[in-house]
Regions:
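Charge-lined substrate channels and their catalytic hotspots, especially those that engage the 3′ end
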Residues: 1-247, 251-297, 308-310, 326, ...
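Structured C-terminal cores of nucleic-acid metabolism proteins
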Residues: 411, 440, 444-644
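Short coil/turn segments at secondary-structure boundaries
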Residues: 177, 192-195, 212-215, 314-316, ...
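Conserved, well-folded catalytic cores of nucleic-acid-processing
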Residues: 25, 88, 103, 107, ...
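Flexible loop/turn segments at secondary-structure boundaries
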Residues: 170, 229, 252-254, 387, ...
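Feature marking long nucleic-acid-engaging regions of large polymerase/nuclease enzymes
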Residues: 138, 223-435, 449, 496-514, ...
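Alpha-helix initiation and N-capping motif
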Residues: 2, 97, 159, 173, ...
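Residue-level detector of short coil/turn "hinge" positions at structural boundaries
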Residues: 29-30, 187, 423-424, 449-453
């Protein structure tokens, strides 16, 4: 049913018989119109799910995207989080309002909860809706007592029985499974899917005909040091000034409509945790046959990009043999110390392209923006607790890969523009609205960064970061600017990418971990290598596919964020009653303090005192909640001197 409801956003020619009563006499009668022999959802109506946060219900659309998730009004108290509902949307300057109209489908009759004692009885408390009435289970109190304290369980709501035990909430090793389960991420692949993956994994590159042999070219991959799924490799021919970008040809191993394809599409993206990955494809493919491992012949789609004429980039089906799998740290050491065990031709390729990449980046930033994302990498011990946190910043090695990938992605977007008249699978990013811009100006004013009169939004962002660098506030200001942006989205129609400054852009370079790239590969291969017979069919499904991918992208981010929040809450429990230097990050309903010693750990403080953003304080951690993933504390002192 969910597939049918999503199709109403884009128009459906015929209403399937089982759903006809919904349209003719049922809850969808007032919400659906017929236009040019297609049925569409009327303007102002939306279908989606409920997401609870801090006792408020938010609306998550199946296909539409809002700057902020609409707040649901008049929702009946009995509704479960995973129910599909029809809403009327009313736009507002701050946040859209969703008025509940009808329930369409209870997607699942299970719920994640934890066991706790209330009124001398062990009951189940819903994880996402802990404010609701506890669930009394059919199991005997004696049997429930045998389970660990605060045991996390999956409950069959119809039977009021436990269907799965995840483990004790206090056990840090539960966190991966818990975050995945809370957002209904399927963890395991079906037997059919695993068998099919194993079959394709046994095929050799030599089994595939009509491919260009690139195995003489010394490609290199550059990834995080713990990476195992190598999507892309590069080589720069200095003499010809041609950049070669090779990307794993995953579509050869994942037939359209096969169990492999269906399960990859359901996942949409790989989920990454600090010590593990839950891949979009089975490991035999994602870390095996598709991964561009050194000294292994692999199928690849290879771009040859002449840097003197980017419009003449050409895409080929090839066989490659990567010369080296390297980590960013290794390449950075080589670029700074000019010492490496890499072959000379690889060294020359990297040094030659670095010069080009830095120039490309400089030119790109005249129209695009460098968001200076400071990524916090968590290192966990064997018990699943945070051992240390490292802040990772962009380096020359990152620039090398980033600029090469941007060129390949742009080249792919150009093919869509040229051959499909601006239709396909695009990656788009809208400029913030005037309201969003004003809010950012106000927040930066608190940081004593003022917007000069008549300065446009884009020049002001650069101006703000320049001042932030001088004030040593680059991290804080970058965080504010990133928060002010719209989400980048997938679109079936060409739109610009504000952040990058590109008129046209797509995702091509990560087909092992993103279904969007895999789908784009199929479209481009059909166009270039198969007489374009299936292009119209593939294009027809892109509106629905892009809507799915946008929802799955959001879900993946929520899973990863939920995991990190709970890890920080666990860390805070080890630091109770201890005091730390911190800086005020936000002043809203309370004060949010970021710790200097544990970067990324945010402490919520309820206080009647007035604090300003960037004020240096001493904060004591008083409480942490593993269910909400929140940390509370109290400010014990204002620090006058500068905290470096």
């Amino acid at each position: 049913m969910q597939g049918f409801l999503r199709s109403l956003f884009f128009g459906v020619k015929k209403i399937p018989k089982p759903f006809a009563p919904l349209i003719e006499k049922g809850v969808l009668k007032e919400a659906v119109r017929c236009n040019k022999e297609r049925y569409f959802l009327k303007e102002g109506f939306d279908i989606g799910k409920i997401e609870w946060a801090e006792n408020k219900a938010f609306f998550i659309s199946l296909a539409k995207n809002y700057p902020k998730d609409p707040l649901i009004k008049n929702l009946p108290p009995s509704f479960k989080t995973d129910a599909l509902i029809l809403c009327k949307i009313e736009c507002s300057k701050k946040r859209p309002i969703a008025f509940f109209k009808a329930a369409l489908l209870n997607a699942d009759h299970t719920m994640i909860a934890y066991l706790a004692k209330k009124n001398n009885q062990i009951v189940a408390i819903p994880f996402k809706e802990s404010f609701k009435k506890p669930i009394l289970l059919k199991h005997s109190q004696r049997s429930l007592l045998e389970l660990p304290r605060h045991c996390v369980v999956k409950i069959d709501l119809k039977k009021r029985e436990i269907s799965e035990i995840l483990g004790a909430l206090e056990d840090p090793l539960i966190d991966e499974n818990l975050s995945l389960s809370l957002f209904d991420r399927i963890k395991d692949f079906s037997k059919d899917c695993l068998n099919l993956a194993q079959h394709y994994a046994q095929l050799k590159a030599s089994d595939f005909k009509n491919r260009i042999n690139y195995s003489h070219i010394p490609f290199i991959t550059i990834d995080p040091k713990d990476a195992k799924d190598f999507d892309d490799a590069i080589f720069y021919d200095q003499e010809k000034r041609v950049l070669f970008v090779a990307v794993a040809d995953v579509s050869e191993f994942v037939p359209k409509h096969s169990s492999l394809d269906k399960e990859a599409r359901i996942r949409g993206f790989s989920v990454y945790f600090p010590n593990s990955v839950y891949p979009m494809l089975p490991l035999s493919l994602s870390q095996g046959a598709c991964s561009l491992k050194a000294f292994e012949k692999r199928l690849a789609l290879v771009y040859e990009i002449p840097l003197d004429n980017l419009e003449n980039a050409r895409l080929f089906q090839g066989v490659i043999e990567v010369r080296a799998n390297c980590a960013y740290e290794e390449i950075n050491h080589f670029l700074s110390a000019n010492q490496s065990s890499l072959d000379k031709d690889l060294q020359q390729s990297l040094l030659g392209f670095l010069e080009v990449a830095l120039r490309l980046k400089k030119e790109r930033l005249k129209k695009g923006f460098n968001f200076n994302s400071f990524e916090n990498k968590l290192y966990l011990n064997k018990e699943g607790r945070i051992e240390k946190i490292e802040t990772q910043k962009e380096s020359d090695a990152h620039t090398l890969i980033e600029e090469a990938m941007l060129l390949a992605n742009q080249s792919s977007a150009n093919l869509l523009d040229k051959h499909f008249h601006n239709k396909g699978i695009y990656r788009t990013h809208k400029e913030p609205s005037l309201e969003q811009q004003k809010r950012l100006y106000g927040k930066l004013f608190d940081y004593e960064i003022m917007r000069p009169k008549n300065m446009g939004f884009f020049p002001f962002l650069e101006h703000a970061l320049k001042i932030a660098k001088e004030k040593k506030l680059e991290r804080e200001v970058s965080r504010l600017i990133i928060k002010s942006q719209n989400l980048a989205l997938y679109s079936p129609m060409q739109e610009s990418h504000f952040g990058l400054g590109f008129a046209s852009y797509t995702h091509f370079t990560s087909p092992i971990r993103r279904y969007s790239d895999l789908a784009l590969h199929r479209l481009l291969k059909e166009l270039l290598f198969h007489q374009a017979k299936g292009c119209s069919y593939l294009l027809e499904e892109t509106p629905e596919l892009c809507a799915e991918l946008n929802a799955l992208q959001k879900k993946t981010a929520l899973i990863e964020r939920d995991f990190v929040k709970r890890k920080f809450a666990r860390l805070a429990l080890e630091l109770l009653e201890k005091e730390f230097l911190g800086v005020v990050l936000e002043v809203k309903d309370g004060v949010v303090v970021g710790l200097k010693e544990w970067v990324g750990l945010k402490v919520l403080v309820k206080t009647n005192k007035v604090f300003k953003p960037l004020e240096k304080v001493c904060v004591k951690i008083t409480h942490a909640d593993l269910v909400l993933g929140q940390v509370w504390g109290e400010i014990t002192e204002r620090i006058k001197e500068h905290v470096s």
